[in-house]
Regions:
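Radical SAM [4Fe-4S] cluster-binding motif and immediate context
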Residues: 140, 147-187
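Glycine-rich beta-alpha loop elements in corrinoid/cobalamin-binding modules
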Residues: 4-135
Length: 187
């Protein structure tokens, strides 16, 4: 974790610093969103994602940054031992984030009781807190994504699939954790 924190600050070796500082940070800071979510789902996204978080926090420490993604789900135990990570983010959502993000937004707008947010890891009074037990979404109760209007260049119908778990065959890809819909494009 110390090496990672060095890399995201290394002006000579990290090409994302100047790119983000010049092209993205000014508009993010000007827009002043209530919540910035950074999803990191592959190891190749760790350095750019954390670099972005660091630059936002340095430019606007009051903006709330939440990190999520499967990388951090796999690193839950390591996150507990990495307090420096919370210098560049306010919290981390592990496992599934639909309910967690909704409750996080509700708490930010209300009592700010982050202990009520499932799957959240955050630092409070210098202590890293991991909200457990971890919550698993019932995918059958989630709304289907709205990809309309469909592009007519791909034909008049197609199938959309969503899978909870990794993108390769594993025990996580049980049939009850998968749903599909058929999408018909308008004529």
């Amino acid at each position: 974790s110390k090496d990672l924190m060095k890399v995201i600050r290394d002006e000579a070796q990290n090409p994302y610093i100047s790119l983000f500082r010049d092209k993205f940070i000014p508009s993010i800071v000007n827009d002043r969103p209530d919540l910035i979510g950074v999803s990191i789902t592959a190891t190749s996204q760790i350095i750019p994602g954390l670099t972005l978080c660091r630059l936002i926090k340095e430019a606007a420490p009051d903006l709330h940054i939440t990190i999520g993604g499967s990388i951090f789900t796999r690193l839950v135990d390591n996150i507990r031992r990495c307090p420096s990570l919370f210098d560049i983010t306010d919290d981390i959502v592990v496992f599934e984030g639909e309910t967690a993000l909704l409750e996080l937004v509700n708490q930010m707008a209300g009592k700010k009781d982050f202990s009520k947010v499932p799957n959240l890891i955050y630092r409070q009074n210098g202590k890293i807190t991991v909200n457990q037990p971890f919550y698993s979404e019932n995918v059958n109760q989630l709304p289907a994504p709205n990809w309309m209007p469909c592009s007519s260049s791909v034909g008049t119908s197609g199938a959309a699939f969503n899978r909870v778990g990794c993108s390769v065959a594993s025990a996580l890809m049980r049939p009850e954790r998968t749903w599909s819909i058929t999408v018909e494009a308008p004529p």
